[in-house]
Regions:
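N-terminal accessory segment detector
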Residues: 1-114, 131-145, 151-155
């Protein structure tokens, strides 16, 4: 196990990068990532954020989740901003994102950038609000821009 924060970050980068490559080789990276994210997020919410209560407003829920993630030491809340309403959230994620290294590597290799933060936020909204949200990375850069939009359940 890594003994430094930098070592842990490198381990996370390699894990996420490998997971994305495996997902792409299976043919449907978004579906695979959603399954992995949901499983991990449910456990994370139970263990690391047992008192987290999301507002019914998607924007407020994203802000609260980000602050709770900051308090748990997982990521920095000061590098993320959100605006929107109950059904649509626009966010900006800065340089302190723990997944930036993986996204940058994939971008530089000409591979699709799958925003793990957007995945996590859309899954958190689905779990906590029992509502389906589509995510989109509208711009990779400094900062990254994401959009989450409430959709109807598919039956």
């Amino acid at each position: 196990m890594p003994t430094t924060k930098e070592g842990l970050q490198r381990l996370l980068d390699f894990f996420i990068y490998g997971m994305l490559r495996a997902a792409e080789s299976l043919g449907n990276a978004p579906l695979f990532m959603r399954t992995v994210e949901e499983t991990g997020l449910r456990k994370f919410l139970l263990q690391s954020m047992p008192t987290f209560q999301a507002s019914d407003n998607a924007t407020e829920a994203c802000e609260a989740y980000t602050k709770a993630g900051d308090a748990s030491g997982f990521f920095e809340s000061r590098d993320a901003t959100f605006r929107g309403d109950a059904d649509s959230v626009q966010g900006e994620i800065g340089d302190l994102c723990p997944y930036r290294g993986v996204c940058t590597l994939r971008h530089d290799e000409g591979l699709p950038v799958h925003c793990i933060r957007a995945f996590a936020l859309s899954e958190m909204l689905r779990i906590r609000l029992e509502a389906d949200f589509d995510w989109k990375l509208t711009r990779f850069g400094r900062p990254c821009r994401i959009k989450l939009t409430r959709t109807t359940w598919r039956t």
